Amino acid sequence: MATESILITTLPMDFNSQMNNVTIGLNDNETLCENWREIHHLVFHLANACFAAGLVIPSTLNLHMIFLRGMLCLGCTFFIIWAVLFRCALDIMIWNATFLIINFMHFVYLVYKKRPIKVKNDLKDIYHRMFEPLHVSPELFNRLTGQFCEMKTLAKGQTYAVEDKTSVDDRLSLLLMGIMKVSYRGHFLHTISANAYIDSPEFRSTEMNRGETFQVTITADENCVFLCWSRERLTYFLESEPFLYEIFKYLIGKDITTKLYSLNDPTLGKKKKLDTQPSLCSQLSVMEMRNSLASTSDHEDGLQNFLRGTSTTSSQRHNQQEFYNAYGVGPLSHAVFC
């Protein structure tokens, strides 16, 4: 006891006054705090309420990250007010000011990412028709059409490609406005309307075989406007965007299928639309895609008869089967499509 009294008398007066509120107990049932301090100011509780509200925002909400950062910013602001006006605590103010700056910068970044992105007026129609239904974002579409894509025009009568002369390795084009006609050795095959790829069969074919030339002639039937991608740069871009790569595979396959049907029915290009055709297997070459009809007969009469077709059901079925046989896919069945 004498030792304990000596220790207490040597302690500072401030410490002795604080010890009055504390009882050091030997039993587990005794409490450490005898007298609790008063409740903090309302601003302190508002800060914690903001933190709690931000943490319980469901992640399924579209803007949940923006709301979370906003509530954290508000909570840090209340803590700074409480530390400056009611506690005079410099350390609390500095820490919360740091947290406020970090959260506010992230908040601004998230709001910037959510800004409405506009598609160019010239490309709105092609975006809404082809890419938006496949959930391609405007931001990704603008990247696709802005970096290595040019908008070009062709006057009526000008040629986009000449058979056996124009290389197929350089570009891929998408027709925005106008009509083009495709012919083989002077024989009309089909038309290409707006919102369709101009050279999709050649693009698919050159994935396997490079150095080929167009086997058909493509001519503007009226004034045309089209998007033109550099083949090499487009390939590199799609390799870095797997989602967009799959979208391109689907759209090109669908476009090739439409062209196949229009070969068998030349009126299809102008009067009908195939909106839900399946994609075609990539093994078909350019010659098989557009010129197989000519390979069925070396005579002009045979080609003309095949292209012309008849109105009877039996002749239509015969021409359709001959069409698929010319492509080298055997009996007519759904198994030929991917």
Swiss-Prot record:
Kindly report every residue range on the membrane side named Extracellular.
1-40, 87-91
Predominant subcellular localization, coarse grouping:
membrane
Q: Does the keyword Kinase apply?
A: no
Q: Which residues lie on this side of the membrane: Cytoplasmic?
A: 62-65, 113-338
Query: Which pairs of Cys residues are joined through disulfide bonds in the record?
Result: none
Name the membrane topology term.
Answer: Multi-pass membrane protein
Keywords, ordered alphabetically:
Cell adhesion, Cell junction, Cell membrane, Developmental protein, Glycoprotein, Membrane, Tight junction, Transmembrane, Transmembrane helix
Q: Name one GO biological process term.
A: positive regulation of locomotion
Q: Which domain of life is it from?
A: Eukaryota
The UniProt function text for this chain reads: Cell adhesion molecule involved in the establishment and/or maintenance of cell integrity. Plays a role in vamp3-mediated vesicular transport and recycling of different receptor molecules. May be involved in the formation and regulation of the tight junction (TJ) paracellular permeability barrier in epithelial cells. May induce primordial adhesive contact and aggregation of epithelial cells in a Ca(2+)-independent manner. May be involved in epithelial movement during corneal sheet formation and regeneration.
The protein in question is named Popeye domain-containing protein 1-B
Q: Which gene encodes it?
A: popdc1-b
